[in-house]
Structures are given as C-alpha cells and as structure tokens.
Regions:
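Hydrophobic/aromatic positions within or immediately flanking transmembrane alpha-helices
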Residues: 12, 36-37, 65, 92-93, ...
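Residue positions within transmembrane alpha-helices of multi-pass solute transporters
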Residues: 17, 21, 74, 98-102, ...
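Structural motif at transmembrane-helix junctions in multi-pass transporters
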Residues: 30-35, 78-96, 111-114, 164-171, ...
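Membrane-interface interhelical linkers
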Residues: 1-70, 74-88, 135-146, 177-227, ...
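Hydrophobic transmembrane alpha-helices of multi-pass small-molecule transport proteins
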Residues: 44-47, 101-108, 115-135, 259-278
Length: 278
C-alpha cells in the first residue's frame, strides 16, 4: 500500500470513528435535539467565519446550501426522535445504510448516474442487512430510522449537486452555517429560547467540540478522496455502522450483540459492493 493510499485509509477510518463518537454523545444526551442544535450552531458559526476569511467566490450558487441546511433541520429533528425511540445499534446502521442506498437510487433518477449489475447486487445485500436489523425492532422504531435515512439521502443528493456547481470547500462550510441558522430558527419558533440560551451557557465547550468533530469528519473524507478513489473511501467511511453496533451492544448494554453486529456487517458488505461496482 502506497503512502498516499495509507493516508487516505487512516483518514477515512478516523472519520468513521469520529462520526460514530459524536452520534454516541447525542444518544447519551438528556435532550437530543438540544445537543444536535448546539453542535450544529457552533459548527455553523465556525463555518461562516472561515468562509468569510477565505472569501466566498463571485457567482456562488446559494440555493443548494440553503436547501441543504433546511433538509438538515428535518434530519436533526428526525434523528433526535429516532434516538429517543430506539437503540443506538439499530437506529444508526439502518439510517446510514438506507441513506446510502436511497442516495444511490436518487442519483439514478435525478443526477443521471448509472447502476451497474454489481451495484445492484450491493444494494440487494445491504437491503438484506437492513431487513435483519429491522426485523427484531418495533415497527415505529424501524420507520423512524428509515425516516432519518431518507433525509440523509435527500441532503446527499443536494450536496452532490451543490459541490459540483460551487467550490467544494466553501460550499461545505456554508452547509454548516445554513444548518445552524435553520435549527436555531426552529428552536426559537418552538419556544425553546430559554433552554437554548441556558444550554449554550453551560455546555458551550461540549457543543463546540461536537461541532468541530462533525465538521472534521467531513473534512477528513474530503482529504481522503483526494488521495484515493471515492468508492474506496466511502466503503471505509461506512464502517461506522459496525463500530456503532459494537458500541451499542457492548458499551450501552443493548441486546442482540451477534445479530446486530452481523447485520451491520452485512450492510457494510453491501455498501462495499455498491461502491466497488461504480
């Protein structure tokens, strides 16, 4: 393995661990929506400062960033509710796995992507893993996780378009800014201003660290895809579903260690086949 590919491998695996870590923090939070709000708000402020410092290019196409921020709001609401309802080792793998699959289907429908026979096999395998995970979950819990996955797919498609028509780095920064804005607006309209202010005063450091972790996860993936094929990086990145299955069953004491880890591995295998078929 060359030094460049090794660097990409380490970056992608680190991103997987970091993404699983901040989701674990959200799951363990007393008020999960508030935790996600604080995380996205601090990331959004940081993103805006950096974007202004480096300069927003003339002719920047704003609508994808705004649309992505709005979709991320619904993703955050759905994710918080799903973590309230279901186990970590069920919600996360179903949401991430279904999100990747729906994004692949959406790419065919809306972005002129094409599915090869191997990609179809990968989708079938991943769907099988998701069915195994959902089979022993309450219907409401499984549907909530699938709802999260639909928003993952939706913002992934919008961001794919947005990164193609804009500078990818500045666009990524402004996604966080738009998400923080819409999430804050939602909280204010829901009458949670006092809770938000109190939480920011007492937990600003944790919010900032979680926000930095969220942003850093994205940047690690961006750096990795410059050094290795996108499919290779994506497959490693989605290894987080196995990490979460292990953490949920071993660290959080959730039931079904072998079944959930096995099903998560099947989801990961399907995603690996999917990206290998590109």
């Amino acid at each position: 393995m060359s030094g460049t590919v090794l660097t990409a491998t380490l970056l992608a695996l680190a991103a997987a661990v970091l993404h699983a870590a901040w989701n674990l923090w959200v799951k363990q939070s007393g008020d999960r929506w508030l935790a996600l709000w604080g995380q996205m708000t601090t990331a959004g402020i940081g993103g805006l400062v950096i974007a202004v410092a480096v300069g927003i290019p003339d002719g920047f196409v704003w609508w994808p960033a705004v649309a992505s921020g709005l979709i991320h709001l619904y993703y955050i609401v759905a994710l918080a509710r799903s973590y309230d309802l279901a186990d970590f080792s069920v919600t996360y793998p179903i949401a991430r796995g279904s999100g990747a699959l729906l994004a692949a289907a959406g790419g065919v429908l809306f972005l002129d992507d094409h599915l090869t026979p191997l990609m179809v096999v990968g989708i079938a395998v991943a769907v099988g893993g998701i069915i195994l995970l959902a089979d022993h979950a309450d219907n409401a819990h499984a549907l909530a996780a699938l709802g999260v996955g639909s928003f993952v797919a939706f913002y992934s498609l919008v961001d794919s378009h947005g990164s193609r028509v804009n500078d990818g780095h500045v666009y990524a920064l402004l996604i966080f800014t738009a998400t923080g804005f819409f999430t804050t607006l939602h909280g204010l309209m829901a009458g949670r201003r006092r809770e938000m202010v109190a939480a920011m005063r007492t937990s600003w450091l944790r919010f900032s660290l979680a926000g930095a972790a969220s942003a850093l996860t994205y940047w690690m993936v961006m750096l990795a895809v410059r050094r290795a094929p996108v499919g290779y990086v994506t497959a490693l990145r989605e290894s987080s579903v196995v990490i979460v299955a292990l953490v949920g069953t071993r660290y959080l004491g959730e039931d079904g260690l072998r079944r959930r880890v096995g099903a998560a591995c099947i989801v990961l295998a399907g995603l690996v086949i999917l990206v290998a078929g590109r």
